[in-house]
Regions:
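Membrane-embedded helical hairpins/re-entrant loop segments and their flanking transmembrane helices
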Residues: 75-102, 264-279
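Hydrophobic/aromatic residues in alpha-helical transmembrane segments
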Residues: 36, 75-83, 121, 257-264, ...
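Transmembrane helix-loop-helix hairpins in multi-pass inner-membrane proteins
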Residues: 1-47, 52, 103-216, 297-389
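Hydrophobic alpha-helical transmembrane segments
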Residues: 24-28, 62-66, 93-98, 175-180, ...
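Transmembrane helical segments that form the transport core of multi-pass membrane transport proteins
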Residues: 230-286, 291
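Transmembrane alpha-helix interface/packing and boundary motifs in multi-pass membrane proteins
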Residues: 102-112, 265-267, 281-301
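Membrane-interface interhelical connector segments
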Residues: 201-237
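A short amphipathic helical element positioned immediately N-terminal to and/or at the very start
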Residues: 48-56, 125, 225-238
């Protein structure tokens, strides 16, 4: 019989990201942005309708792009299972798929910067019985391992392009500036990893009065968890035997996404240097953080188009290539994500009826790799733990 985990996530119907009003608002915004980017703007700049050249695409290269997309989704699921599932909470591959694909739909339909997917994943893991603190710590590690490739790619390609090691436009604004900003962000992440887990206690000791100490301790919880998650991420990198699948999943996810874009350019008979594809891809994806566009719809399209035009790629090729990329990488998986959301609701109900994943027995101890290359002291087997909030 499964133990009860207090406040394990609430009912699926209470998820704020899935409401009829939000869906209608999102549909209107998405439609307006897509019409503006792919119909109105090309006409204003004298390029005609961006859809006119879609019929010229080579079907073989479109098939290659779809294959890369399947690889991207598979590696994304593997990344999540390696960081969040496994011995931490023995999720099956099907359960991991449902959480990830449902989160993908939430991210792409209801929020910018991935927040919708984070909310849904947090809910699902809490429904599965994982303690709140552990969910937060592992979600930080999952996101950090996934997005660390942003600054790394911008730095690497920026330096290679600027120094002429690889072919492509080497202007400062497309190479040095992005690399410098990425370097600062990477440095900030490394410094945050140094935040000690007891930072709240240390800072509270400096505050005056019980109320002030309580406020300081509560505020410090978030950076403390971020620090723990980042150190966990570093441990995965430094322990290939434990973190190999996670690192491979994150690497494969971004490599496959870049592969989709590369294949769509090939579909229109245009050769774009690989370093330019990577740099333009990540520069465009920064627009995903644009707050008014759901999952960067319209903003990412415009960002990628602008980046490649600045790199000297002909506008009449950039528009259809980016459009096809977004159709394959963004819109094609969406129906699967919506179906996975409803499957996940049924799975969450089954967990409550048949037992929580967090209660499932495991054959190994929950040893967590640390950044110094050592394994943390083993805890009790998961199935033997007492309920925790």
């Amino acid at each position: 019989m499964s133990r009860e985990v207090p406040a394990n996530g609430g009912d699926a119907a209470d998820l704020p990201i899935f409401t009829r009003r939000r869906a209608i608002q999102t549909a209107i915004v998405v439609f307006a942005l897509l019409v503006g980017i792919y119909f109105l703007f090309p006409k204003l700049v004298g390029l005609g309708n961006a859809l006119d050249r879609l019929g010229e695409a080579n079907p073989l290269w479109i098939a290659v792009a779809i294959g890369f997309n399947a690889l991207a989704l598979g590696t994304y699921v593997a990344l999540f299972k390696a960081v969040v599932g496994g011995e931490a909470m023995p999720l099956s591959w099907r359960e991991t798929y449902e959480i990830n694909m449902a989160g993908l739909a939430a991210t792409r339909l209801f929020s910018a910067g991935g927040a919708g997917g984070i909310v849904l994943s947090f809910w699902a893991l809490r429904k599965g019985g994982m303690p709140r603190h552990e969910v937060a710590r592992r979600m930080v590690a999952f996101l950090a391992l996934q997005y660390v490739f942003y600054p790394v790619a911008l730095i690497a390609c920026g330096v290679l392009l600027r120094t002429g090691v690889v072919s492509g436009k080497d202007s400062v604004e497309l190479t040095v500036v992005p690399a410098a900003v990425a370097g600062l962000l990477l440095l900030a992440g490394l410094l945050m990893a140094l935040i000690p887990p007891d930072v709240g206690r240390r800072l509270a000791a400096l505050a005056r009065g019980e109320r002030s100490r309580a406020v300081v301790a509560n505020v410090a919880k978030a950076p403390a968890i971020v620090g723990e998650g980042l150190r966990f991420t570093a441990g995965l990198f430094l322990n290939p035997s434990r973190g190999g699948l996670a690192v491979l999943g994150a690497t494969g996810f971004w490599a496959a996404n870049v592969g989709i874009l590369w294949a769509t350019f090939k579909a229109f008979g245009v050769h774009v240097p690989l370093a330019v594809v990577v740099q333009g891809f990540f520069l465009g994806m920064v627009a995903n953080l644009f707050p008014l566009a759901p999952a960067g719809v319209g903003a990412v399209d415009a960002g990628m188009i602008g980046a490649f035009v600045l790199f000297g790629i002909p506008e009449e090729t950039v528009f259809p290539a980016v459009l096809v990329y977004r159709l394959v990488a963004f819109w094609m998986p969406l129906p699967f994500g919506v179906v996975a959301f409803f499957q996940l609701r049924q799975t969450a109900q089954r967990w409550e009826d048949e037992g929580l994943p967090f209660d499932r027995p495991v054959t190994i101890k929950n040893e967590v790799p640390t950044a110094d290359g050592k394994k943390a002291a083993p805890e009790a087997p998961i199935s033997a733990r007492r309920p925790r909030k």
